[in-house]
């Protein structure tokens, strides 16, 4: 999915507002995903999935760090996320549908925390961005 110049501007501005809360929002999105889509828990059998667990918080930070990397390399996400794509395709073997589920939960989390910034245009741009990240992360499944 191609991001327009306006999409890129919206994504960078929105992620800039996330700032130091990125890890917190990443963990919250994971918790939302586990609660809303319980089958996603199967990829984390060794995690304490309770609210506020250190493992979920640490993984939420990893998710947020990957998104920060993608935002910073929005014009070259395949290169920037190549190692992460390899990890998810070859080692973790995460079902690609789970990226869509997490993307949805990230959008809900961002809308809850940034209601003034979460305009329809920003929502659409973030949705396209997360779809692009998902496409990159699943590109090596083929």
UniProtKB/Swiss-Prot annotation:
Q: Which residues carry this modification: N6-succinyllysine?
A: 8, 12, 17, 41
Binding sites annotated in the UniProt record for O2: 59
Expressed, tissue-wise, as follows:
Red blood cells.
Record-level GO cellular component terms: blood microparticle; haptoglobin-hemoglobin complex; hemoglobin complex
Q: Which UniProt keywords apply?
A: Acetylation, Heme, Iron, Metal-binding, Oxygen transport, Phosphoprotein, Transport
Query: Entry's CDD domains?
Result: Hb-alpha-like
The positions annotated for binding heme b are 88
* Sequence positions bearing Phosphotyrosine: 25
Which Pfam families has this protein been placed in?
Globin
| Residues modified to Phosphoserine | 4, 36, 50, 103, 125, 132, 139
Q: Which residues carry this modification: N6-acetyllysine?
A: 17
GO biological process: one example: hydrogen peroxide catabolic process
Positions carrying Phosphothreonine are 109, 135, 138
Q: Which residues form a coiled coil?
A: none
Q: Which SUPFAM superfamilies match?
A: Globin-like
Q: Which InterPro entries match?
A: Globin, Globin-like_sf, Globin/Proto, Hemoglobin_a-typ, Hemoglobin_oxygen_transport, Hemoglobin_pi
Under PROSITE patterns, the record lists: GLOBIN
Q: Does the keyword Heme apply?
A: yes
Q: What does this protein do?
A: Involved in oxygen transport from the lung to the various peripheral tissues.
Q: Spell out the family assignment given in the record's similarity comment.
A: Belongs to the globin family.
Q: What is this protein called?
A: Hemoglobin subunit alpha
Q: Which gene produces this protein? A: HBA
